[in-house]
Amino acid sequence: MTDLKNDRYLRALLRQPVDVTPVWMMRQAGRYLPEYKATRAQAGDFMSLCKNAELACEVTLQPLRRYALDAAILFSDILTIPDAMGLGLYFEAGEGPRFHSPITSHADVVNLPIPDPEQELGYVMNAVRTIRKNLAGEVPLIGFSGSPWTLATYMVEGGSSKAFTVIKKMMFAEPKTLHLLLDKLADSVILYLNAQIRAGAQAVMVFDTWGGALSGRDYKEFSLRYMHKIVDGLQRENEGRRVPVTLFTKGGGQWLEAMAETGCDALGLDWTSDIADARRRVGDKVALQGNMDPSMLYADPARIEQEVASILAGFGQGNGHVFNLGHGIHQDVPPEHAGVFVEAVHRLSRPYHA
């Protein structure tokens, strides 16, 4: 494998010295870029784009051609695992993801297969290998998965949800069924992420998009417990390097201490957390990633720079910060505003690493 020309993202995750704060953006390969829209049109639909290694590679690399980003992230979807379990993923116009066969009973959970990442999810591994080859050591590649809780919400609700009443009914009325489902999902995620690492992912991230819908007690029992199991099961070394793992619970700022106890390397923060407070609480244990409100990219360039400066000052001197948005970039943000953001992070962060 090629040596990395820019490893500051990996170094920052391990709280090692860097020259400037590394930056990437969640959903950096996406609909805000006209070139992405053109490639997606060529693929026909979203899942066809994910399943074509060459096109998935192309959209992964597109933002790197525009911006001096410090990492690439695999172009895929968190719902690849439930799709590979046979739930029949499809996308409803204006509705988002849906499943033809959602989980409705204990028997459904018992019968769920654990997918082989090199078979049913082989298209993801092909994409990882293709991207690594084409990156040619420019920046590291991030692999990812959804968290067991977040995947379960889609599988039990049958798609996106606002109130999570169906899965919460299962959680309170049939907790054993939900625990069995989450356990199977954790095993599947471990296999899936380890396969991504073997295929060439140099860091991995677990997206717990809906953990913030839970009470503190339920978060620990139904979400964090299974992310902890994943962290314990991951291959943490490959190609002679540590493979850092980042956990991100959207709306999880009140649980950072418990999250840091899992043994992960870094925690993602959304914009509702104060990064100075987060560093005081857990900065001795983990790196922090975040945390500008993605909507700030609608602002004028001077305001974007001001916000970047404010977050950098909040984190303060030293290492262990990866700059990112607090969630995915919005699809109607002007691409040049993303460029202002990336450039500002590098330029304004240098004094913090002197």
From Swiss-Prot:
Its EC number is 4.1.1.37. The record marks 77 as: Transition state stabilizer. One of its GO terms (molecular function) is uroporphyrinogen decarboxylase activity. Keywords: Cytoplasm, Decarboxylase, Lyase, Porphyrin biosynthesis. It is found in: Cytoplasm. It catalyses: uroporphyrinogen III + 4 H(+) = coproporphyrinogen III + 4 CO2. One of its GO terms (biological process) is protoporphyrinogen IX biosynthetic process from glutamate. InterPro entries: UROD/MetE-like_sf, Uroporphyrinogen_deCO2ase_HemE, Uroporphyrinogen_deCOase. Pathway: Porphyrin-containing compound metabolism; protoporphyrin-IX biosynthesis; coproporphyrinogen-III from 5-aminolevulinate: step 4/4. Its main location: cytoplasm. GO terms for cellular component: cytosol. It is an enzyme of class 4 (lyase). SUPFAM superfamilies: UROD/MetE-like (SSF51726). Substrate binds at residues 27-31, 77, 154, 209, 327. It holds the Pfam family URO-D. Homodimer. PANTHER family: METHYLTETRAHYDROFOLATE:HOMOCYSTEINE METHYLTRANSFERASE RELATED, UROPORPHYRINOGEN DECARBOXYLASE. Belongs to the uroporphyrinogen decarboxylase family. NCBIfam families: hemE. Catalyzes the decarboxylation of four acetate groups of uroporphyrinogen-III to yield coproporphyrinogen-III. This is Uroporphyrinogen decarboxylase. It comes from Pectobacterium carotovorum subsp. carotovorum (strain PC1).
